[in-house]
Swiss-Prot record:
Highest taxon above the source species: Bacteria
Annotated catalysed reactions: D-sedoheptulose 7-phosphate + D-glyceraldehyde 3-phosphate = D-erythrose 4-phosphate + beta-D-fructose 6-phosphate
EC number: 2.2.1.2
Assigned GO CC terms: cytoplasm
Pfam families recorded: TAL_FSA
GO biological process: carbohydrate metabolic process; pentose-phosphate shunt
Positions of the catalytic residues: K147
Protein function: Transaldolase is important for the balance of metabolites in the pentose-phosphate pathway.
One GO MF term: transaldolase activity
Top-rank EC class of the record's enzyme: transferase
Organism: Leifsonia xyli subsp. xyli (strain CTCB07)
Homology family: Belongs to the transaldolase family. Type 2 subfamily.
Pathway given in the UniProt record: Carbohydrate degradation; pentose phosphate pathway; D-glyceraldehyde 3-phosphate and beta-D-fructose 6-phosphate from D-ribose 5-phosphate and D-xylulose 5-phosphate (non-oxidative stage): step 2/3
Protein name according to UniProt: Transaldolase
Length: 381
């Protein structure tokens, strides 16, 4: 008799089979050096990594994994900004090497590692384009994705970065209208790349739609309204918004413009569900995983959410494509209560950029202190 436990498919394997690719929303040198990434690939179906300034600030503030490189950088007298550039691109290059087999096995679709442009450039298209090219050249791996925020200025940067043949992870998307602009920016970039004779098949992109932050902001407003009708809508907006984003994706890539590019070798820009860690302890800890299962998507998870998904996620097939009417009903009900969708998403975009700028500042101070300490230690010897 076969042991049922030995043949059971894990929830993460089932999620992958349903068309949802699992990426880890975390990276550190300790995780790279310890074999932790390889274990997640082998055991929990992880096929990519996303990073951001908050993640790097936390990684550098903990442990001694960066000490040797910091000492070397301190000895050369580099600026804090250049030290950050060296440290973060080294981590991303090493992680990209670890995921190279996944990249090869999936024909370049997965095995992707993301690194974000400096968030202070979010409203400067030209500087973002230059930084995206600099990051891509420094990491110099075919499976790197450059993260560019979906600000108005970011849309131009997305187009020009894609046009240069560089793969892009578009981050901080909250509104459906901005998402349409992101898709247009991607397609325009592909058209320019095609005109320049660039092989479109090597260009990948994901559009990172943030989920739990939408609930956090809207639930705050619903609590302030305080009626039974308002409270009944709590924790529903984020999923509804993401489901309608998938509808936008389906419609856009069923259109003649996208189909012509795909026929020329281009890849669809996949929706990526970001901010999928549950903030409200009263909610199921896999809510933003199980309720957003749809083909050709990515879910990037903090490790806590990944572990919960692997341990006990209850999957029920596609939970997106048959839910568009209900999702629209949620947004309509919010509007009827006076919750201003455009104000919510504009607030979230502004706060998202600001939070990453704060994290970047923390990263700068952490590296500045590490460089100073290393220089002082060397001088004392």
């Amino acid at each position: 008799m076969t042991d049922a436990s030995s043949t059971a498919v894990s929830p993460t394997a089932a999620l992958s089979a349903a068309g949802v690719r699992i990426w880890l929303d975390d990276l550190s040198r300790e995780r790279i050096a310890s074999g932790g990434l390889q274990r997640l690939i082998a055991e929990k179906n992880v096929v990519g990594v996303t990073t951001n300034p908050t993640i790097f600030a936390a990684a550098l503030a903990q442990g001694a994994a960066y000490d040797e490189q910091v000492r070397g950088l301190a000895a050369t007298g580099v600026s804090v900004e250049d030290a950050i550039f060296e440290i973060t691109t080294d981590d991303v290059a090493d992680a990209s090497d670890i995921f190279h087999d996944v990249y090869t096995a999936t024909g370049g679709v997965d095995g992707r590692v993301s690194i974000e442009v400096e968030p202070g450039l979010a409203h400067d298209a030209a500087a973002t384009i230059a930084e995206a090219k600099r990051l891509a050249a420094k990491v110099d791996r075919p499976n790197v994705l450059i993260k560019i925020p979906a600000t108005v200025e970011g849309l131009e940067a997305i187009t020009e970065t894609i046009a240069a043949g560089i793969s892009v992870n578009v981050t901080l998307i909250f509104s459906l209208e901005r998402y349409r602009g992101v898709i247009d920016a991607y397609l325009t970039g592909l058209e320019k790349a095609k005109a320049a004779g660039i092989d479109l098949s090597g260009i990948q992109s994901v559009a990172s739609f943030f989920v739990s932050r939408v609930d956090t902001e809207i639930d705050k407003r619903l609590t302030a309204i305080g009626t039974g009708e308002a409270l009944a809508l709590k924790s529903k907006a984020g999923i509804a918004n993401a489901r309608l984003a998938y509808k936008v994706y389906e419609e856009a890539f069923a259109g003649d413009r996208a189909k012509a590019l795909v026929a020329a070798g281009a890849n669809e820009q996949r929706p990526l569900w970001a901010s999928t860690g549950v903030k409200d302890p009263s909610l199921p800890d896999t809510l933003y995983v199980t309720e957003l299962v749809a083909p050709n998507t990515v879910n990037t998870m903090p490790e806590k959410t990944l572990d919960a998904t692997f341990d006990h996620a209850q999957l029920a097939g596609d939970t997106v494509t048959g839910e568009y009417a209900g999702a629209q009903g949620v947004l309509d009900a919010l509007a009827a209560l006076g919750v201003d969708y455009d104000d919510v998403t504009a607030t979230l975009e502004r706060e998202g950029v600001d939070k990453f700028i704060v994290s970047w500042g923390e990263l700068v101070e952490t590296v500045r202190k590490a460089l100073t300490d290393a220089q002082d230690s060397e001088a004392a010897q």
